[in-house]
C-alpha cells in the first residue's frame, strides 16, 4: 500500500513539474497554450511578453546600404531675409518725372515732360515739351515745342515751332520757324531769319534769306514774284 502511494505521488510530482499547466510558464521554448475556454483549472497569471530585441542596422550611405537619412541634394530651402525681398528701389522724394529712356542725364533745375529717347542731355533751366528724338542738345534758356527729329542744335534764345526734320541748324537769336524745313535741308548759313518769318518753307540750302519781307513761295535772292518775272 505504501509503495502505491509513493508511486502515485511521484507521478503527480512529475506531472506538476514537467507538463505545462493551464496558463503557467511552462518549460522549454514553446509558447504557453491559451487558457481553457470554460474557465477550468486553477487561476494563473497572464503570460509575460517582452518586446523583441533587435540590434540597429549599421551601414555607410556611400556604400549603398540601409536608410542613411535624407539625400545630400535635398537641402533645406534658403530662408527669406528678415525684411523680405525688395521689389523695386524706392522712388525719389519728389517722384520720377518721366526720365530719359537710355542714360540721359537728369535736368538740374527743370524736368522732362517727355524726355529724349536716346541720351539727349537735359536742359539746365528749362524743360523739353517733346524732346529731341536722337541726341539733340538741350536749349540753354528756352525750350523746344517739338524738337528736331535727328540731332539738331537748340536755338540760343528762341524756340522752334516745328523744328527742322533732319539735322538743320538752329536759327539765329530771335528768329523762329513757322513750319520748319524739309528733309536734309539746312537753314540759311549765317543769315538771320526774316522779320516776318517764313510763310511756307525755308529757302534751299546755302541760300541767304532776304533782308526784310517774306517769301510767298520761293523767291530769288533779292526780290519777290508778283505774278510775272521782273525785267
Curated annotation (Swiss-Prot):
It is found in: Secreted. GO terms for cellular component: cortical layer of collagen and cuticulin-based cuticle extracellular matrix; extracellular region. Sequence repeats lie at residues 75-78, 79-82, 90-93, 105-108, 114-117, 121-124, 137-140, 153-156, 169-172, 192-195, 208-211, 218-221. Residues 1-16 form the signal peptide. One of its GO terms (molecular function) is structural constituent of cuticle. Residues 75-221 are annotated as: 12 X 4 AA repeats of A-A-P-[AVI]. Tyrosine residues can be cross-linked in vitro, leading to the formation of insoluble high molecular-weight complexes. The keyword Signal applies. Keywords: Cuticle, Repeat, Secreted, Signal. The small repeats A-A-P-[AVI] are also present in many proteins constituting the protective envelope of other species. Component of the insoluble part of the cuticles. This is Cuticlin 2.
Amino acid at each position: 500500500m505504501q509503495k502505491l502511494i509513493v508511486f502515485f505521488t511521484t507521478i503527480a510530482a512529475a506531472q506538476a513539474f514537467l507538463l505545462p499547466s493551464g496558463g503557467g510558464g511552462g518549460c522549454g521554448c514553446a509558447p504557453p497554450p491559451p487558457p481553457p475556454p470554460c474557465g477550468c483549472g486553477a487561476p494563473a497569471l497572464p503570460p509575460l511578453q517582452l518586446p523583441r530585441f533587435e540590434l540597429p542596422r549599421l551601414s555607410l550611405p556611400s556604400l549603398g546600404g540601409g536608410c542613411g537619412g535624407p539625400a545630400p541634394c535635398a537641402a533645406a530651402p534658403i530662408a527669406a531675409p528678415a525684411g523680405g525681398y525688395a521689389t523695386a528701389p524706392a522712388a525719389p522724394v519728389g517722384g520720377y518725372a518721366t526720365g530719359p529712356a537710355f542714360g540721359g542725364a537728369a535736368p538740374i533745375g527743370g524736368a522732362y515732360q517727355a524726355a529724349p529717347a536716346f541720351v539727349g542731355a537735359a536742359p539746365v533751366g528749362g524743360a523739353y515739351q517733346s524732346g529731341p528724338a536722337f541726341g539733340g542738345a538741350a536749349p540753354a534758356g528756352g525750350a523746344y515745342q517739338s524738337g528736331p527729329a535727328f540731332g539738331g542744335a537748340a536755338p540760343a534764345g528762341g524756340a522752334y515751332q516745328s523744328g527742322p526734320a533732319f539735322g538743320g541748324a538752329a536759327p539765329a537769336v530771335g528768329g523762329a520757324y513757322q513750319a520748319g524745313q524739309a528733309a536734309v535741308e539746312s537753314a540759311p548759313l549765317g543769315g538771320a531769319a526774316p522779320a516776318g518769318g517764313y510763310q511756307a518753307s525755308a529757302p534751299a540750302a546755302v541760300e541767304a534769306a532776304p533782308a526784310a519781307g517774306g517769301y510767298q513761295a520761293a523767291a530769288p535772292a533779292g526780290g519777290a514774284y508778283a505774278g510775272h518775272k521782273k525785267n
